[in-house]
Design a protein with these regions (language model features):
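Class I (Rossmann-like) S-adenosyl-L-methionine-dependent methyltransferase catalytic domain
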Residues: 1-75, 80-85, 128-201
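Residue-level recognition of oxygen-bearing side chains
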Residues: 94, 111, 167
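A short SAM/SAH-binding and catalytic strip from SAM-dependent methyltransferases
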Residues: 96-110
């Protein structure tokens, strides 16, 4: 029973769609993984508990400090405070990058593209890029554009939204392809969350 509780603790806060990738064997213990926009590390916990080489970066200094406090074995080099558009990692450094509920805070289309392009730069060829973010897919007629790429969505919040046109454009510009079918969950017509699992070609 205690062992089962321990396993549940490892995955309690992990994005359910990231868990799907974990269970499918997407990630190997020899891979370098980056959680881009990691916050306090909710999606890093399983990897840390299972001895993966995982890195995290976030612009929020307090969140990184909390993550370091909870995981004292992690070095400053593995948890830099940095914006996604200026990642302090070499080209082709990581086998996999995770970005969950981050990109919809882009200020505009240029900012979104800068963050995406920077993640692709750090990703190795044939590496995977996992993205979860809000989109307009399924609620196209219920969102209100207020600035370049930023909308008010039916739940009242302001988000940068991924559109099919933008997705196609970005995939072509960054030489990306789908590893899995594109998925979108409509939450009672209040917001739509899309999941992308992409490969750098």
């Amino acid at each position: 029973m205690q062992e089962n509780i321990s396993h549940l603790d490892q995955i309690a806060q992990t994005d359910i769609y990231l868990l799907d990738q974990i269970m499918k064997g997407r990630y190997n213990a020899t891979d370098k993984i980056l959680d881009a926009g990691c916050g306090e590390g909710r999606n890093m916990h399983w990897f840390l508990q299972n001895d993966f080489e995982i890195y995290g970066t976030d612009i929020n200094e307090a969140a990184i400090a909390q993550l370091k406090s909870a995981n004292p074995d992690l070095t400053a080099e593995s948890l830099p405070v940095a914006p996604l558009e200026k990642l302090p990692f070499a080209d082709n450094y990581c086998n996999h990058i995770i970005s969950s509920a981050v990109l919809h805070f882009a200020k505009n289309t240029k900012h979104f593209k800068a963050m995406l392009t920077e993640m692709v730069r750090v990703l190795k060829p044939n590496g995977s890029l996992f993205i979860r973010m809000t989109s307009d897919i399924g609620i196209e007629n219920k969102v209100k554009l207020i600035s370049d790429g930023v909308y008010i969505i039916p739940d009242g919040s302001k988000r940068f939204l991924l559109t099919k046109t933008l997705l196609t454009e970005c995939m072509q510009e960054n030489n990306l392809s789908f590893l899995e079918p594109f998925k979108t969950v409509n939450v009672d017509d209040l917001r739509c969350m899309s999941t992308l699992v992409l490969q750098k070609n």
